[in-house]
Amino acid sequence: MTASSTKPGPTPCAPRSTGAHAPAPAPAASTPGAPSYHRLTRLSPVLGVRCAPPRRGGGWLPAADLTARPEAVCELIAHDARQGLARYGRPLRPDVAAGFGLHRFVWPVSLLFTLPWFLERRVPLLALGDVSLRRRTDTVELTVRPTGFACLPGDPASGSPQARTAADEQALAAELRCALGGFLAPVLSAFGPQVRRGPRVLWAMATDAVVEGLWYAGGLLGERDRARAELSALLAPGEPAHAPGRPGACGDPAPAPAPFTPGAGFAPPAPGRGGASTARGAGEDASGTDRARASCCLVYTVEPRDMCGGCPRVMRR
């Protein structure tokens, strides 16, 4: 899907050699999420993350600009419009270019939240002002400034002033949905007029990007099956939302996983349904399981043959 740099940058996050569920180091040993960001940067040919303050200039865009400056949204969309013209030889519809731009923002940025949860059982509590990105033709670079985080009671850093302790795994998953949803909500509002979709479809688009991002990272880590299982649990429909009862935490009675679309979309492939897997959507994995996307990226409007294998137009007929 989107791209990024494999270089960790001038101030790389410290590496970690422990397993996926090993406890995170003591608070003085690392920045929250840093070990996960370092592992992703080392493994991914398209995405690089460095722990640093937000940057501006030289192609860098502070994420906060997307809600503070409408022209920043237009700049990102123009980038995808140019890429679409180069790839397909014809212009993208403006709303399609906007949808691509939104997906290619949410896809990498969501990993700043989901990957530390997956690898360290820590959820960084990030604001738009903590992140910046630089997109190139085939790569995306991110800077992130982690401060507070949510963790489990057994985390060695749970007593840190930075930490907010969740009671159990279910509560930590709720913290993740809350933190990521709160980060994305103003971004979806900023893109909405350009994408020309209502809130329900915008959140479906965001859900697809979140799922596809961590599923991609799980593949790099050799843990795609676990990523699929944990995403399915994270977005399982019908469970009551956890209300941690702390300032800044979600106390919303809406059914989990609001505001995200319920269900990660993983299911055995239906017989007789085709569709070519592309970089915009997760198609079939090594175990023969298809993922049905919650939204359509509308690529067929510019290239009818270039349709995701998991497109709801293919999977849900």
Q: Could you tell me what each predicted segment is?
A:
Residues 65, 70-285:
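Hydrophobic, aromatic-lined core segments that form the binding pocket/scaffold
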Residues 1-100:
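Generic N-terminal leader/targeting and pre-domain segments
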Residues 1-7, 310-317:
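Short amphipathic alpha-helical segments
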Residues 293-316:
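Local cysteine-cluster metal-coordination motifs and their immediate loop/turn environment
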